[in-house]
């Protein structure tokens, strides 16, 4: 390849990334097709827009507010085409937030084998525009350090060809900070209204962050090794979430504990579903006051009495609504008699396994098999819990459900 051709290819890569950075890129499923915003719209671009919006006959008569309402319904490629038609259209598109559904920033992922067979320090930024991951409306960039510079790589997919890795060098900057700036630019482009957020970065650079509040965030996953990082993110999300995931470095999972006082946060106490891949210092009182119907955490302080009361609350109709599961992970030697005190237990004997018609085998394959009991509701005897006691977990599942068929009522057992 001649030096002129090499320079042309390098310039094209720079143009591509600049357009990424300014949010003027056309990102399609498995094909990063970059558009030049300074290039005039082609007849094909205009025709596709005409078909979508029914023609331009009255378009110039609309004021900017009306145009913005129309632009809200355009997908990102269509916006890129429209903004090239005129300065007024460019301004209308620029002022209309992009619907960003999910943003992920994760450091030191290890499965980038198309780029390197050896592990390397990196930050991955993923942006998804649609709730369905398989829609293809998403992209992924990988940031890494190259001496004093930052290397940005992404994979370009071309039909009927092998994927190609594209790259760009950003001079004299830190890859970690550049990745965060890029991810936060996409949040800003979506008016900070994405529904989901994943942050798995050991040293998120708070000092350069532009995030003030994420008003519509309903699902967040954060990895941290100190409570202040969790606290920083909690200050920027609503009290009421749909689900919450907190985790720590794998090496610290069995030593570092989320403090008891922090667990009083409404994002934890009110969420209907949470998973903590770390130790959590819940007291019995906090555990009993949780609103979640599906929980999992490494248990430190919850006692046998707390677990016993939790089950009794459900049995008497005072438990959380639509309970699904509670997994308390611990290698502590719990006193089984204290956990089950005052409860009517049905062991998983041959009679139960025959009645449950294959459920026990399915349960063992999916959930593991410790010492299992079925515990029935006093409000509705066709509803029941499964209590499974093993060496590393006290697991409670809502497995028995009232079912009516052909005029008969019975318990149907299934894994929630």
Question: What role is predicted for each listed range?
Answer:
Residues 1-416:
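Non-core capping and flanking segments associated with repeat-based/extracellular domains
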């Amino acid at each position: 390849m001649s030096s002129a051709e090499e320079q042309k290819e390098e310039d094209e890569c720079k143009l591509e990334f600049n357009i990424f950075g300014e949010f003027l890129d056309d990102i399609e499923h498995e094909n990063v097709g970059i558009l030049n915003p300074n290039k005039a719209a082609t007849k094909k671009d205009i025709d596709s827009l005409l078909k979508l919006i029914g023609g331009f006959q009255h378009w110039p008569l609309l004021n900017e507010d009306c145009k913005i309402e129309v632009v809200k319904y355009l997908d990102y490629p269509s916006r890129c085409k429209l903004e090239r038609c005129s300065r007024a259209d460019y301004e209308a598109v620029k002022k209309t937030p992009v619907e960003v559904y999910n943003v992920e920033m994760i450091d030191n992922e290890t499965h980038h084998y198309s780029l390197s067979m050896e592990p390397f320090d990196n930050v991955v930024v993923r942006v998804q525009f649609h709730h369905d991951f398989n829609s293809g409306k998403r992209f992924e960039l990988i940031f890494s350090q190259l001496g004093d510079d930052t290397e940005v790589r992404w994979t370009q997919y071309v039909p009927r060809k092998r994927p190609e890795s594209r790259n760009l060098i950003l001079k004299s900057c830190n890859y970690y900070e550049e990745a965060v700036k890029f991810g936060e630019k996409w949040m800003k482009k979506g008016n900070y209204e994405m529904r989901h957020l994943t942050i798995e970065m050991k040293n998120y650079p708070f000092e350069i962050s532009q995030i003030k509040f994420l008003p519509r965030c309903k699902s967040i996953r954060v990895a941290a090794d100190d409570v202040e990082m969790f606290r920083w993110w909690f200050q920027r999300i609503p009290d009421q979430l749909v689900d919450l995931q907190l985790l720590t470095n794998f090496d610290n999972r069995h030593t570092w504990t989320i403090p008891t006082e922090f667990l009083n946060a409404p994002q934890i106490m009110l969420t209907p579903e949470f998973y903590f891949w770390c130790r959590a210092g819940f007291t019995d009182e906090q555990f009993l006051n949780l609103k979640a119907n599906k929980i999992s955490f490494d248990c430190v302080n919850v006692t046998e009495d707390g677990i016993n009361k939790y089950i009794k609350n459900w049995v008497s109709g005072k438990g959380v609504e639509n309970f699904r599961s509670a997994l308390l992970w611990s290698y502590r030697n719990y006193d089984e008699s204290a956990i089950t005190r005052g409860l009517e237990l049905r062991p998983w004997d041959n009679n139960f396994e025959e009645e449950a018609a294959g459920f026990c085998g399915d349960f063992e394959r999916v959930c593991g098999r410790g010492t299992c009991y079925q515990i029935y509701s006093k409000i509705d005897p066709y509803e029941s819990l499964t209590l499974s006691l093993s060496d590393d977990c006290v697991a409670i599942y809502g497995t028995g459900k009232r079912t009516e068929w052909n005029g008969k009522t019975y318990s149907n057992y299934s894994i929630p």
